[in-house]
Amino acid sequence: MSTDTERVEEGTETSFLESWRDWYHLPVLGVVMLFMFWVRAQSYGRFVTDDGTPAFAGIDSWYHWRTINWTAENYPHTMPYEVWTGFPTGRYVGQFGTLYDQLIVTAAMIVGLGDPSQQTLYTVSLLAVPVMAALVAVPVFYAGRRLGGTLGGLVSALVIALTTGQFLSRSTVGQLDHNAVEPLFMAIAVVAMMVAVTAGEREKPIYELVADRDWSALRTPAIYSVLAGVALTLYIWVWPSGVLLVGIFGVFFAVQLTLDYVRGISPDHIAFVGAVSLGATAVLTTLLIEQPGSTGSTSLGLLQPLLALLVAAGCLFMAWLARQWNNRGLARLYYPAAIGGLIATALLVMWLALPGLFDSTVGNAIRRMVPIGGTATDLTIVEAQPPESFFNSVFREFGSAFYTMLAGLGFLLLRPLFGRKFRAEHTLVIVWTLFLISMAATQVRFMYYLVLAVAIVNAAFAAELVRLFDLDLESGLTSIRSLETYQVIAVVLV
């Protein structure tokens, strides 16, 4: 009897340990999120006035507050028009009256049981930004987990929780600007695209399957690709200038399809993901158009669906060109040069035939993403100015985590040299990170975007440290006892 009891207890203990190993990250992630919210809600009392008069930090917060009030009275409609800007005629302002304001009002509607009071609306608005900042830990964790396992994901969540700088200062109570919700939805869009391209690599969709309408073989990559397109659309809906992520994805697909073809892999797999995801984005952003004749990046107009459609078409064209290249027996090494020449030609034609669209795409890309050629208007806006010293700025923002991120990028790039698989999502993270670094060097406000890459890529760095020191974390203390002194010193220094 005692033996049977011991076996049952041993089995129960083993089952508990296995469950804890599989799910321990959830309570840890929950604690991290609570900590992020708690830190940002410390100054709540400063914004609770005796007479109930709203008090916000920053100027743009008041624009959102007026939009939120109007939306609450006319729910679910929003007002992308600012009557006090250019008074008395007012003007369209695409960055206000977005999904962000609608989400806050929806939360207030739930709390206020369909009829929120002014006080309820104000309280929800005060707490919305800290909540959204805390939620950033979720997509950051899952992105980090894809690069460095569960431990890497938790490292990513801890990095973003402990990071000070602009991401913290722009997401505290009293701030009502869209600066906190932008990183949240960008992180969701990037994670969704990571999942989609991995599904494309795994399921290997090709043109023949589409021609034969073999939906059973195409279902999984198609679903994940559409979801990635939806996530990208939500990001643009929150911030119309988020169309820059469409451009980043476009560069990624151009690089990845070229790499695949040169390595002897069919570009159809990733081209399918690009065409479906960006095609879905083109359709959905068309439904969001508020200024049909506008190609500006700050309004929901033609730019977003047109650029998404161009990227989708570009993916299809590159896959078609690869097949033609094979049919003619041309050397694969010349394919990248052909793609580069065609892109340059397309930009030249756009500059000559569609100068307005060229300026909206290339001009805005240079203005926001390349640390040269800033406009005089940008230089008069504090947050749009380039940092005086980039490396001093990133050290103030992220400490040594920025440099461990660079090491993580190096580890990702060197994976093939060590016989380890280099996946498409690795290319995506590398391209995206390089763009975020360039953006942060262009406008100081984009430091609150760079924090995403710093946190996520540190997961790869942490995973490589574990691999380097051969730490088997699941086997207990055995491997830790085998550590040499120099290895412990190295970890402490890092």
Q: For each predicted feature, which ranges?
A:
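Start-transfer (signal-anchor) and selected internal transmembrane alpha helices
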Residues: 1-50, 59, 135, 140, ...
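Membrane-embedded helix bundles of polyisoprenyl
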Residues: 34-36, 128-146, 150-216, 220-258, ...
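Hydrophobic, aromatic-rich transmembrane alpha-helices
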Residues: 253-254, 316-325, 341-352, 399-420
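Membrane-interface helix-loop-helix junctions at transmembrane boundaries of multi-pass membrane enzymes
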Residues: 218, 264-269, 329-339, 357-361, ...
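Hydrophobic/aromatic-rich transmembrane helices and adjacent perimembrane loops
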Residues: 427-430, 435-478
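Perimembrane helix-loop-helix junctions
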Residues: 206-215, 219, 245-333, 464, ...
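Juxtamembrane membrane-water interface segments that cap and precede transmembrane helices
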Residues: 112-117, 288-300, 362-398
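Active-site lumenal/periplasmic loops and adjacent helix-entry segments of GT-C-fold
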Residues: 41-187, 198, 204-208, 240
